[in-house]
Amino acid sequence: MELLEYLKRDEVLFLCHHNADPDAVGSCVALKYLASQLNPNGKFRISADSVSKLSRNILNEIGERVDIEIYPKLPETVFIVDTASINQLKVNFDELKEREVILIDHHKKTDLADICKYYIIKEDYPSTSEIIAEIFKELNIFPPKNVRIALLCGIVYDTKHLKLANSKTFELISYLIKDISFQKILYLLSQESDVSKRTAHLKACSRMEIREFDKLRIALSHVSSHEASCAKTIVSIGADVAFVVAVRKKEKEIRVSARCRKHVSKYVHLGNLMEKIGKELGGSGGGHSEAGGLNAPYDKSKSKEKVIKEVLNLCYKRFVEEYKKAKQN
């Protein structure tokens, strides 16, 4: 297996995306353990510019850590894990291109793969943690309890508490769950949302504009943070599609999260849509059929309000175009 040769390197950095979720963190924890087994004298660490509250709870439970840093020092070998586009990382891109980059992901393949020496992308897997768990199984290496907890949390989180699970998912859960209470996994993933997230949800709903097209309820809104969670919440309370924009002046960045119901994804793949819109805005995007996101630079010559309006109108326009095109075929 070619992957093992890269894991055996003397120094490896495992990179998570912004606000690293349990799938990203669980996958990195497992890869770091595997690398340490293959090269006991190696130097291995995990880095992200931020991690989610749920991920922090899991890391505390299993006694692992993620170094929180922007523009980390890059060793010769860098693993990028559970990340759809380069804009989800706070790294020196020119420096990264000169490194030995390995990508393991379950999102739609994007330009990020072009700079990689080696990559494993399995879009049909509901989580990256399942890809990693399968690697352990193929190698006949049974991971320790803390690593299995991390992988199980990643799987359950990214499958929306098994709503997106398939038969392979349950096979891998059965493989990992020995001596672990499933109730414990659910508990680690059900910590109450912090006040800032709940406040963002309320603001997103209060600012929401609903447009109707072909009997679809398309919700457009904006917040300062937690845009992905807000988009998910808006769909859960009745929208067919939701686009939520967050403009971060300090980081000079625009973020958009999109979510939709399953019947909509039969016509429009949100990951593909976000990739196209991301490029149109001078950034990048990607994701899955029912969930996508993009990052793009923020032009400070325009007001925040104007940018929000322009981006939401663009998302609506491009979605309608793609939907019409799909229905005609």
Curated annotation (Swiss-Prot):
Residues 284-303 are annotated as: Disordered. Gene3D superfamilies: 3.10.310.30, inorganic pyrophosphatase (n-terminal core). Transmembrane segments: none annotated. This is Uncharacterized protein MJ0988. SUPFAM superfamilies: DHH phosphoesterases (SSF64182). One of its GO terms (molecular function) is nucleic acid binding. PANTHER family: BIFUNCTIONAL OLIGORIBONUCLEASE AND PAP PHOSPHATASE NRNA.
